[in-house]
Each structure stands twice: as C-alpha cells, then as structure tokens.
Design a protein with these regions (language model features):
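Helix-turn-helix DNA-binding elements, focusing on the entry/boundary residues of the two helices
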Residues: 19, 30, 45-48
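DNA major-groove recognition helix of helix-turn-helix/homeodomain DNA-binding modules
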Residues: 46-61
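The alpha-helix within a helix-turn-helix
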Residues: 12, 23, 52
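Short, charged recognition helix plus adjacent turn
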Residues: 2, 10, 15-16, 35, ...
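Recognition helix of helix-turn-helix/homeodomain-like DNA-binding domains
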Residues: 28-43
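Residues in the helix-turn-helix
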Residues: 21, 32, 61
C-alpha cells in the first residue's frame, strides 16, 4: 500500500521545475517544499490550489490516486 499522499516531486520533474523554483514562486522556505516532496508533511488545501495554478495542473494531478480513492470511501 502506498503511503505517499502527494505527487509533487513527480509533477515538478514532469514540468522540469525544481524545488527551489517552487519555493520562490510560493515564497516559502526551501525545507518546506522539500518536506512536501518527500511526503513527510503536506501542503494545506489553499497551498495545494496555488501549486496547481503555478504548475498548470489539476489538483488531482498533485495527489496520489490511491489516496483520492480512500477519501471517496
């Protein structure tokens, strides 16, 4: 069973963007983005919306599909 909630690291790689770039866009500490990318912490919903707009993806693209399914049960 997968424990990763978000796919931020994967989406950043797909978009050829770095953690540093994202932290500059969001004006957050680099360690915060690093924690999100390793799934040791999660962005709040407001930040998730900002990230999706910055990266030009749907919020669902940032979340692990297995995690989404567990929310729908």
């Amino acid at each position: 069973m997968e424990t990763d909630i978000n796919r931020l690291k994967i989406v950043l790689a797909e978009k050829k963007k770095t953690n540093k770039w994202l932290c500059e866009q969001l004006k957050v500490n680099p360690s915060t983005v690093s924690k999100w990318c390793t799934n040791s912490s999660q962005p709040d919903i407001e930040t998730l919306i900002k990230i999706s707009k910055i990266l030009g993806v749907e919020i669902e693209d940032l979340l692990n599909k297995h995690y989404i399914k567990t929310l729908m049960i």
